[in-house]
């Protein structure tokens, strides 16, 4: 009698193991099912702040349209159109600068500084550097040409192509506290002190 009970128990255990192996081999789920993975869309604050320019290309040559007219250069001196997207949350104004770190001055060369651009702006049209098409309420600082407004590339003849950094700043203040005759360096100091994010495109020019 005892032997029969043991035999039946062993037979039952073997059958159970065989059934489990068959179920696993057939690809059936034997554990607790996992919930489906959710696709998370990044918030605006997680997206990257970007700048683009229809007439400029990254590491590409700047057209004569945007080159300085003077000092031996014969361009049209029209500031390029700029566009930006995904500014960070809390942006209260924007600023735009154009700077050549390769100029043989020891401190580079400021070609353009525009600030107090309203927070609802998404870019600047071509020619905004003259002030005519600039956003209402914006201001421009003195460049290293000794005047306000855009001054295009004009590197020394024979230099390797210079790098021109067109940069947009997203700022945490709606207006910069600088005097009307502030230099580009002074404005740049205040931009870096109040920036939330920056984006830039670098283009080249040589002659």
Label the predicted regions.
Residues 25-207:
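N-terminus-centered regions that define maturation/targeting leaders and the start
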Residues 11-20:
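Bacterial N-terminal signal peptides
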Residues 2-11:
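Bacterial N-terminal signal peptides that target proteins for export
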Residues 2-3, 17-18, 75, 105:
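Generic secretory/membrane-interface signal
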């Amino acid at each position: 009698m005892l032997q029969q009970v043991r035999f039946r128990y062993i037979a039952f255990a073997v059958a159970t193991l065989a059934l489990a192996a068959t179920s696993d081999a057939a690809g059936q789920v034997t554990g607790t099912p996992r919930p489906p993975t959710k696709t998370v869309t990044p918030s605006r604050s997680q997206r990257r702040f970007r700048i683009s320019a229809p007439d400029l290309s990254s590491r590409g040559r700047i057209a004569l349209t945007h080159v300085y007219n003077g000092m031996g250069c014969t361009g049209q001196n029209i500031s390029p159109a700029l566009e930006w997207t995904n500014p960070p949350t809390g942006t209260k104004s924007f600023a735009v600068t154009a700077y050549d770190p390769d100029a043989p001055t020891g401190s580079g060369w400021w070609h353009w500084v525009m600030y107090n651009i309203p927070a609802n702006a998404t870019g600047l049209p071509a020619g905004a550097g003259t002030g005519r098409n600039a956003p209402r309420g914006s201001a421009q600082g003195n460049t290293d040409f000794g005047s306000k407004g855009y001054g295009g590339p004009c590197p020394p003849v024979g230099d390797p192509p210079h790098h021109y950094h067109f940069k947009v700043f997203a700022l945490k203040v709606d207006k910069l506290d600088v005097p009307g005759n502030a230099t580009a360096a002074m404005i740049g100091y205040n931009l870096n002190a109040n920036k939330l994010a920056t984006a830039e495109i670098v283009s080249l020019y040589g002659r």
